[in-house]
Structure formats: structure tokens, C-alpha cells
């Protein structure tokens, strides 16, 4: 037996004796026997992964510390969308570094997500108040992506009858790069200037622009309104605390980055972007929206609203492919605003503006020409032929400024800037600081109050803030409390040793456009990670840029698109997608300019190879790609996977491998060896980056050698086709995956995969006598997850899958994936991190629920008044003076003979009214004046 370092044993849940007992329950003598039965021999990797030997936690932390110590952290005045911040320690400690917040899943199950839903609701309120627009989503991926998404909203608003987009001012270069990437496959015409014509869908107004200047856009906005074009503001949210809200001057949408609300730069991310829109655009915007509804007893409750817009329902007709966004960072931004309150935010903004104004005045007094008269935090100076020399002098003093071109530099102030910085920077230009007024746009200062809601005024002491964040966290069920057995989500351990480096100064506080010689630690860490991921997947190249799995899909499909174009095959636009695919697949294909053709699945869940062959041959002249998830979304290793790939290749297409289920492959098989040309990897699933309650995520792509030239580029690297604002996307959290792989080693990673497969098969074995297990492969085995058919309870007792999901809350569990990929079923993925004790507890709960359903079927409990129909049960409901139900209070909240009371979770609300919440959409808290 292989001996593992302590970390491997601590990451994997079952002990040696548990593993033996589980294998015995399956009637198997060894783990190898199980893997032989579950994984087709034709795809097995018959060698060890060539990765560095595993290190202990202490040694891995020391090695990474040495690597990241090569970074030189200097004070950044580069700006361009990234700013130094003071993250309040009360937020860093109690939210950012708290597993109760970062290990939670996207809040689809409202009743166990009220804490983070409430804070996201406050985030939306914050954005609505800053922008003056009534509807905001609960974050997007970054500012550049948000601009592209807003343009998509404008085109949908015009029913795709208008395709021209006017960039009315100077946006950040990375934003233009991402917009251009998005525009090409969708046929958008990107123009600059001030000419609005009848084909213009929207104008994009930077507020301020990349030079820091507030331009005069009154005429172009008026022209846009006259022509029916929408107005998109790209607005700095700190500036909006003292500047007029964009809605006041005609914006229909506003987007931007919330990074400077307490979120470190992190060499580019992760950060939450915002999007706010007018009410008329509500139903066509991307991303999650948190809405307010009521529960079964009339109590206010939060939920995800208007989900029919989203990819998991609308597929290729969705408003976007956005799935995971940036919930954790949005919650940090909301907490930052709650901590400081409106007066505190304005004080920060006013101080920043004053520093910039005094710097501008000093330069002008010294005869230096600056761009514009109206500014907030940035001064752009003309220094003919001296830009590099001035930047070098600033660097010597420990400060980085932006070189725009050989004759122009930019200096951006933020909340970390000091009087000493002002003096030192002015001296570079032969100037001395002078007194000066804060220069704003005349008539554009914020006149009205904002953030009058009580929550933004009630948490000024650290004691109050600490308890506020604790109360919210206690409302939720995250991995720190119980197993989250969501199928296709891989909710595994996010080990403390993996998470610790994210807060290091050498990780958190670097600007993504810092000089290359100062970020050698990041260069080494990302190079290691790219090489390791290539070895794990078999690919020739990897891009770490995509900052979500959905963006990885998009980047991979765009690589395929550009490859076909380079070979004179740009007409290839057909993407074959199985009917069982994740909803992001067809949504991403549409964004990449492809037309989706659905491939049927057989009754046993496998792809219908005859249908695939027929459709590949039918579209052979235009076939671009085939998207496949493996193991399948039904939790099975399909024996015909290599044949599927051969059919597609024989007909001129490329194979896109959805890596959502890579946790069943690592160390056992490699996508490239199977026949894939490109694959995205969800680092927030297989490789231990936490889900954060709905983000951040990271979705790098691996590609075969012929696709390497078509990986995403970046304007800072002198290349094109960026899919995210920063070259390495959410760079700071890549250290989590680096640590995971470094501590596991190749053998440990393989062992984790085996344990995940064992846990899933053990669950299937324990439950199959009570619930049908819908799909199995050869030898009656599943992969790393299984579909449990709860429709038998519907047939016998009228108990729905939702009833089962809500009842599991009373047993102390987050429900498995509900009604996906098969309606009326639950898909369970235990991951390798769950111990046998917890797995047995889940199985016991599922079996007990079947017993409760039998009581309904037998007439012991009425169909409309039983523990399942009324689940979940809150403490207040259970302690009510009157108890009129035919079951006892104990049966309600301490169910099942084997229930462990120490695992009890009390939901803060009972079942939430989803329909009512969508019919009466409330997605921000009204200001105090609204109650007068």
C-alpha cells in the first residue's frame, strides 16, 4: 500500500478501515477492482503522473513563500481599474478568511442561504444607490466582462436588429480588448467617436475615462436618446459616492468594478463587477439577482429571482453563459460599505479626489500639461520623451506609475495614498504640492443623500460588525457545518493550508500591470501550475486567464473558432451538444457564434452514437465542434467516448471536453489521451478553490498543440482575444490550486479520485434498495456521482423532489442537485473529502425520508400536512404555543431514529415562495425616504 504524507490522509475522508468496509459492502476485494469495473480500460492512464513528490503542509507553505517572495511589492499608482485598498481587518478575518463564507455554494437553496443572500441583497442595494438605477445583479466577473455583458443587453433590447456599439470615450485598454473579443463572433460593430446612427444599439460612456478625465458627453447622450440607443456608463463606484448618479444624466445601464471596496488587487483578481439597469431591462440582464419574497409563514425571505433568464434553464437562449460570478467578493464590497457607511465612503472619496487635485495643481504650476480639467483620482501628464525615465525614478522610490506611451504617464491615487506619496510623486515632475480644490465636473456633484437604509448606519463598532457577520453566517449551511452533496459541483475540502497564502502581502497586493521583473514569483507559480495541469490532462498548453468555468468554455470554443478561421474554414459554425449537457455549453456556443445542434441520448443515458454519427456527417462541411462532458452528466463513464471523438474528427470538427467532472479522472485518465482537443478545468471544483457562495471560480483551458496559438491573449502582453480583464484572470487564488497539487503529488491526486468514485458507489449501493439509481455503467458502477430517482415517492405518496430537498434541511444537509439532469431526481456527488460517518448519515437520512413518505402513502399522515410537505421546520415554528400537525415536534426537527442532534442545523425561514418573489420583484432595499 502506498504511504502518503499526512495532508493526503487529511484531505481524503475515509480512513483505511472505512475504505475496506465500503469495498466489502460493494463485494469487492480492493480499490483497484472497483476502478477496473468503473473506468473503461480503453481510457486508463497506465503510468503515474509525472508531478513533483508531495510535500507536507509546512514544507509546501515554505516553498510557496519562497517563490512568492520573488515578487517585489511596491506601492501602485498605476490605476487603470486596479487600486490599493485597506481591507478592514474585521472583514478580512470574519468574512474573507472564514470558511462559513467561502465554502458555501451558490444559494439555489434559499432556506439555507439567507445570510449570504441578505448580504448580496445589500450589495445590490449599494449598487442601485450609487448608480440611481433600480435593478442590480449580484455581481459579474470583472469590469471588462461587465461592459461586454451590458453591450449584450443592449443588443437583446433591440432584438439583435442593431449591431453598432459606440465607445464614446477612452475605456481601459483591457476593456476594449475583451469587448473586441466578444464582438467578433456576434457581429457587433465597434466604433469610436460621437456619431450615433440608426444602427447604434448603445453608446458606452466612461465615467471617468482611462486618463481620469470626465468628458462632456451631453451631446452624444442626447443624440443616443433621440436615436433610441441605450446609454451604458462605466463608472467608478468610489467616485459615485461624491458624483452624480449615472441615471441622473441619462444612463440606462451602469457597470464597473467594486474592487476598491476593500478587495485586494491580487495581481488581477478575483474582484466583483457590478451591473445596474433601468427597470425595463430587468428580464434580459445576465447574472444572479437576489430578490425578496416571503416564506410559508409570511416572514421576509431572500431568494434567487428570475432564474428563467439563466443558462441552466434557457441554455442557448440564455441572457449569458455566466454561472459562477463573484459572490464572495461582492459580499466583501457590501460589508465594506456597511462598515464605513455613506459618510465614511464619501470621506475616502473626498480625500482621494483632494490628493489628485493637489497633484494636478502642482504639475500645472510647474508647467506640466495634464489631460482635462475635471477629474477624480487620476492625473495624466504629458512629458515628451520622458515617460520611461520618470517611471523609473518613481520605481526607485518604491512607487509604480503608469506609462501610457513614450510621452505620457498616469498617476492614480487611492485610499492607501499619503501626503508623503503626493510630495514624492510631485518631485518627479519638478513640482511641489500646493493647496487646491477638489476638481469635479461642474453641476455633476452628488446632491442627494444615498445609502439611508439602516444597515449602512448600524455597524460602526467592530463588536457590532463582527456580530453582524456572525449572525449572517449562522443562517447558512456551508462545508464547515455539513456535507454539501451537490452533483456536478464537487464540494470538496478547501484546506486551511491552501487558503492561507491568498492573504499574503506578496500574493494580494500586486497590480496586474506591474513590471515583469517585479512579479517573478507569480511568473514561477503560474508556470508551475500550467505545467502540472498539462501533465494531469495531457494537453500541450494551458491558459489560466478564464475567471470562471463558463469563461473557460467560451475561451475554448473561441480557440476552436480561430483555428478554423486560420485554416480557411471560418464557415464552420455547427456545435454538436448532447441533450444531457450542462446549460453553460449551449450558452457558450451561442456566444462563440456557433449554432447548436442537439445530439440525442439513449434511455440508458449514453450518447446515441448513431445520432451523433448521422448529425456529424450531415453537417460535416460546417462542423466546428462537439461538446461533451466526461464522465457524463448522468454520472457514468461511457464506453464509447473514443469512438465519439473519432466520429467528430473524421468530419472536420474539434472535440471540446467539459471538465466539470474531472474529479473522476485525475490520475486515472487524461482528456487529451481520450481524444479531446480542448478542455476547461474548474479549479473551484476539482482543484480545491472554494465556491465562495457563488464565486469566485477559475476555469483555465488546456489545448492540444495545434490550438496553442489560439489561447487567449492580452493587450498587456501585446496580443489579442482576451476573455478577462487581467492576463492571469483571478490570479491570487491560483495559489490555492498550486498548494493542493504540491501537497497531494501525483499519487495523492489519484488516490483522491479513487476515493471519490468509492464514496459515490457506496452511496448508490446503500440507497438502491430504496430508490432506483437511474444510470450505471458496466458492472453496475457509477463514476463519482449518482442520480437517485425520488420520483418513486411522488408516485406512491405525492412527495415531490422539492419536498425531499427541503426535508433534508431538517436532517442537517444541503440538498443534492435537484431535478438536474433528470427532472424529479436528486444527483449526489460526495467527493473524496467526506468521511464514511457523514456519508452514512446522508444515506440514513435519505432512507428515513423514504420511510416518512411511506407513512403518507399509508395514510398515517395527510398528504397536505406531513413533515415533508411542511419542511423545513424553523425553531420558532416548532416552539409555537399551538402545534396542530399530526406529527410531533420531535419528528419535525429531530427526525429519524439515527439522527445526530449535534449535527442539527436550524433554518432561519421555512419554505420560500419562489413564484410570489418573481411576480413581485424586489431586488434592493428602498431608501428611508420611501417609507415617509
UniProtKB/Swiss-Prot annotation:
It comes from Brucella canis (strain ATCC 23365 / NCTC 10854 / RM-666). SUPFAM superfamilies: PLP-dependent transferases. GO terms for cellular component: cytosol; glycine cleavage complex. GO terms for biological process: glycine decarboxylation via glycine cleavage system. The glycine cleavage system catalyzes the degradation of glycine. The P protein binds the alpha-amino group of glycine through its pyridoxal phosphate cofactor; CO(2) is released and the remaining methylamine moiety is then transferred to the lipoamide cofactor of the H protein. The keyword Oxidoreductase applies. It is an enzyme of class 1 (oxidoreductase). InterPro entries: GcvP, GDC-P_C, GDC-P_N, GDC_P, PyrdxlP-dep_Trfase, PyrdxlP-dep_Trfase_major, PyrdxlP-dep_Trfase_small. Belongs to the GcvP family. Its cofactor is pyridoxal 5'-phosphate. Pfam families: GcvP2_C (PF21478), GDC-P (PF02347). Its EC number is 1.4.4.2. This is Glycine dehydrogenase (decarboxylating).
